[in-house]
């Protein structure tokens, strides 16, 4: 996990956008963190989903902010009522204790972009990382669109960082099932045509994860983050990532769907074989991901 030393919130800065109503704080290590409370309105599995999702992405080499369990004290909550959760019935006091905290990427004058104009897509580095992220999200039962922010460097290039994993593993309450298209990035222009080498690398990366080590990683999480439904959904995710044939089927479905929707070139010259008539095979159906694609 991301660090072992305990840190705690020392300064409330502001509330942020989002269904989980996160807040921005300065922590005892001097850094800024986006904090999500355990009793957020989205569901009890959110801290688990955020932390384990970050760990899977890190294991795949996908960029994202570092995270840590962050202690929020009763005195901090009571002295900063602006951080309380807004509900239709009024303000709800956040629960104290260990919360999910991810390092804030917007400090030190960094220019961050959430939505890209059409002219900016050519400036994005690592387009293929979005394909790998989509594959991981499908295996993890992501029930929402993939979120990413883009950090602009001095030369104008944009580096993607993947954020907001709270809807992995069937969502913050668990058990939510959506079609596999629900988990892709909203603007399909980010998915550029893959070379055969990139195609193979994506499957190899996802299929090469040490799932035993990933499972052991949950031991470091706070006990109350590990709900029964979250653990069950996570076990299913690791099972999918261990099935090489299933991964191939999912990748074929992804490629077929984007080629159909975007009018991309057919796949024969790209991969040296015809796309399957029905990419979805029984193995994919068994994942209950509701993937459908007909070439």
Show the residue positions of the predicted features.
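C-terminal catalytic region of ATP-dependent kinase domains
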Residues: 38, 155-295
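Conserved ATP-binding subdomain of kinase catalytic cores across diverse folds
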Residues: 2-113, 137-143, 158, 165
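Conserved kinase catalytic-core segment
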Residues: 113-174
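Glycine-rich loops and low-complexity Gly/Arg-rich segments
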Residues: 49-50, 59-62, 89-94, 125-129, ...
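Conserved aromatic-histidine-acidic binding/catalytic patches
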Residues: 41, 45, 127, 226
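N-terminal intrinsically disordered, low-complexity tails enriched in polar/charged
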Residues: 1-11, 284-293
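Short secondary-structure transition/capping segments
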Residues: 107-121, 190-194
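A general structural signal for short secondary-structure boundary/capping elements
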Residues: 71-72, 145-150, 206-213
